[in-house]
Amino acid sequence: MIIVGAGVGGLTAAALLVKAGCRVLVLDRNPHPGGTAYVYKRKGFTFPMGPLGFGTPSVVIKNLQSLDGEDLKLSPIQYRIKAFDLDIPISHPFPKMIEELIKLFPTEDETIKNFFRNMEEIVSAMNDPDMDPNHSILGKAMSESAMEYLSGLVKDWRLRRVLGSIGTQEPYSSLPLLSAMWNLISNQGIWYPVGGMRSLCDRMVQAVSGHRANRDKFGEIKLGTEVEEVRIERGRVLGVILRNGAKIDSAAVISNADYKNTFLKLIDSKFVSDEWYRAVMRARQTSSNLQLCLGVDANGVDLSSFKEADRIIYRRNQADLSGQIDWSAEEIHPEALVCQELEVSLLSKNDRKLGPEGTEIIVIRTEAEHFHFSRFRPTWRKRIPEYQAYKMRLGRALIQEVENLIPGLGRAILVMDIATPLTFEEQGGRSGGAVAGWSWNYEDGSDYRPRELVRTPIQGFYMAGYQAFSALFMGGIPTAMESGRRAARAVLQGDGPVENIMIPVTE
C-alpha cells in the first residue's frame, strides 16, 4: 500500500491500514512528517507551518484513540475581535454571544437573537440533513447567500460584518457554512493540543511506524522522497514512479496531495476524462496568507491586549473599507496591506515550550493572493533578488500596525520569519498556496453538508486530506483525519471508482 504525502490525512490512513494488518509505505518529499500541521525552527524558536489549533475536538480525539488507545489533552483557545472601536469576545456559546453583542448593539437586540436562533436551527438540521423538516430548512438556507440574508436583517454595518464573517469582512459564504463556523468557534470551541502540533504529528508517525517488531504490521515513512508520477493502466492504479526514476508497485494508492497537485501534476491527463480534468483545473480554492512569525523579548512588549485572548482578529479602526487591494499590481503599498483584517496570535500563551525562557511567540497573518507573488519566482524554489526586500517591507508594515495592539513590538523582536503564498505552496504542498481548501464563497459551492471526495475515477486510487471533502465544515485537521479514515476504509473494502464529478465547480 502506498500513500503519497505524510500530512494528517495520509498519516491517519496509513496508521489505520497498518492496524488492519497491511504493509504501508508513506512517501513525502519534505524532510518532516505532518504536512502543514508541523512546525519549523529558527534560532531556538519553534514556529507554525499552518494550523494554530483546531475545532471539532471529538473527531480528533476519537481518531487518535482508535490509533493508539491514548487520550489527548487539549487547552481552549480564546478569540476576540478588536476592530471598529469594538472589543468582542467570540469564544462563547450562543446564549453568551447574544448577551455580549446586545451590550454593544442594544438597538439590534431582536436581530441578534434571530440570527443565532437561525444559526442554531441550521446547525441542528445539518446533524440529520435527510429528515424532511431538516431538508427543507437547509434548502431554504442555501437559497440566499449570507450577504443577502444579513443585508435584509442587520442595520449596523459593523454588526453585519461581525456576524457574517466572524471577523471584519463582508459576508461571503453560504448560511450553512457560516453556521458551521459559528458553531465551531463558539459552541464547540477551538483547541490547542497540550505538547503542541508537533507532538500530535509525532504521535501519528508512531502509530504508523511503531510496529516494526511485528512483521505482519509494518508501516514505513520515507521522507525526502518525491513522487513524480502515479502509474495507471486501463483505468487501474499500478503504483508510483519516484523522482529518481524508481518504480514501486502497489494495488492501491492514496494521495494526500491536494486535488490540483494530484490530477494536474502527478497523473497524466489521458487517464481521466476531459470533464474531470477541466473540473479540477477550474475549481476555485481559498486565497493564501502572508505570515509573519516573531520571537520577541517578553520584557519589551505590552501584552495586555491578550489578557482575555489568545488570538485577536484585528482591523485598524479608521481603515478604508471601500476599496480592495489591487493584487494585479507589480507591488502593493504596505499601507494598503495593513488596512486589511489581521489575525494576531500570542502562540506562546498556549505553549510555553515554543521559545526560550523570557520570550514570547507572536504570529501575524493576513490574506494574500498567490498570483501577485509568482513574478518573484523564476523557477521552483528560486526567487529574484527583489523578493526578500519586498516581503521585508510588507512585514515591517505589519509590525508597525500591530504595535497598536502590542506596544513595543518593533524594538523587542529577536527573530523574524516571513512566509508568502509561495512558501505555502512549496513548503506546504498547497496548490496556489491555498490555506483552507476549496473556495468558501457562496457562488463557488452549493453544499449544505460536505460531499466526500475520497474516491476517484481510477480503480484503486483514493484521496485524503483537507480537499477530500467539498467543504471544511469540521475545520481543517478534523476534516483531514476523517478523510484518512474513510480512505483507509475504501482501500480495505476495495471501493470502486466514481463516475460523477463531485468536486465543487462554478459553472
Predicted features along the sequence, with ranges:
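N-terminal glycine-rich phosphate/pyrophosphate-binding loop and immediately adjacent elements
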Residues: 1-118, 439
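A conserved FAD-binding loop/helix module that cradles the flavin
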Residues: 51, 468-491
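Rossmann-like flavin
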Residues: 84-177
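A glycine-rich dinucleotide-binding beta-alpha-beta segment and adjacent secondary-structure elements
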Residues: 156-170, 339, 343, 404-470
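Helical element adjacent to the flavin cofactor pocket in flavoenzyme catalytic cores
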Residues: 182-243
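Active-site-proximal substrate-binding core of FAD-dependent oxidoreductases
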Residues: 226, 232, 492-507
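Mid-domain catalytic core of redox enzymes
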Residues: 228-356
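FAD-dependent oxidoreductase catalytic-site/capping-region signature
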Residues: 341-439
